[in-house]
Amino acid sequence: MRLRNRSRGGSHSRLLRPVAGVSVAAVVALVAAGCGSSSPSSGSTSSGSNTIPKGLSISSFTVNLESTMSKLKPLAQFATKGANSLQVGVILPDTTSSVRWVDFDQPYLNDAFADAGYTQAQYRIDNAQGSDATELNDATADINLGAKILIMCPLDGPTGVAIAKLAESKGVTMISYDRATFQGSKTYYVSFDNELVGKLIGQGFEACVQAWGIKSPQVYVLNGGEDTDPNAISFAEGYNKVVWGQEAKSVNAGATNSAGMKLVGENFAPGWDNTKGGTIFQQAFTANPKINATIEANDGLSNAVITDLKGDGVKPNKIPTTGQDATAQGMAWILEGYQCGSVYKAVYKEAQDAVAMATILLAGDKPPAALLNGTTTDPADSSITEPASLLTPVWVTKANMESTVVKDGFDTATDICTIAGASVCAAAGIQ
């Protein structure tokens, strides 16, 4: 069984470097005229079959990547036509908003491509390092090198739109990975059901408040990067609907619910910046020390909040926090009684889904309905939708940690227990 093999080939060095101080709009104007054709090179030979594996669906992807990805080899061979050149470019957003991009997405994507039969020359994976100019440069480089498909997680809306426009102008199909880009007629979306992610956070929060015996919950909400990421809005709509009965990205302070909870305040962490998020919460907690329950949009923000709470002497099982991404630190906080749970988005599924979609589209085929199973809607304009492949997330607590993230190898017991301590893990049955 192949898991997160970081030494495996397929990660290529960036061919275009960021342009300091250049705006997305300026870079688009600069590169548009010079972008080369994405048509396949002449003289290539094809092999394989253009048949999509029977029964391929969002349920096909297991932690044993090879079991499903290897079935795509004939289709990948047909799609790439034997070319010894770039066919699919992948761009991840940064290394700071979440550990997932480096620790999970990149190695799983590498494995998925390799198991599907792609050579190292036929795909490359870059990371924009948090720079919109770098992300656009990487996309431009991929197109110039002949990529027919771009798998891209946009840093923000304007960057995603700029890349989608550039891709469409060159006949390149784009797959928005994890974060949607509502632009272009050749754009698809691969992710988890974002509103469901939010609902799981809300449901987990409510269960935790009850289990921890929080009296008259005075709730503070720390949302994700709503200024840059439409997913953050969907997450908020999900947990706000569950907790406050309002499917909205923002709820006014003073809102209450039938469980006796009261919203004392909310804010968002710009650009998913955990440090800024921690500062925002610290200021709110200082101004309103009666806060005794919190909702956070991911584990990075929860970690920042918990660090502040511990610094103020708060003991376990006193102030609930929430998260997503199922980080090892998040799992440790759950075991220690500082975090209620975390939404586990099995990245190995998302990586396989993206590679399967890319292979099908590269072959000129239409993804089956069991794979392209829904649509995503622009939070800013409900009339704008995008075809989507939506995976199902899981809420992880102390009770199911062993059977989910540990069993899958997403977080190892060693990683979790190094943080939480052997005695804490032993008490929870994590070994």
Where are these regions (language model features)?
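C-terminal motif of bacterial Sec signal peptides marking the signal peptidase cleavage site
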Residues: L30-G34
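A residue-level marker of the well-folded mature domains of exported/periplasmic proteins
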Residues: R2-R14, C35-Q431
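Sec-dependent signal peptide hydrophobic core
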Residues: L16-V27
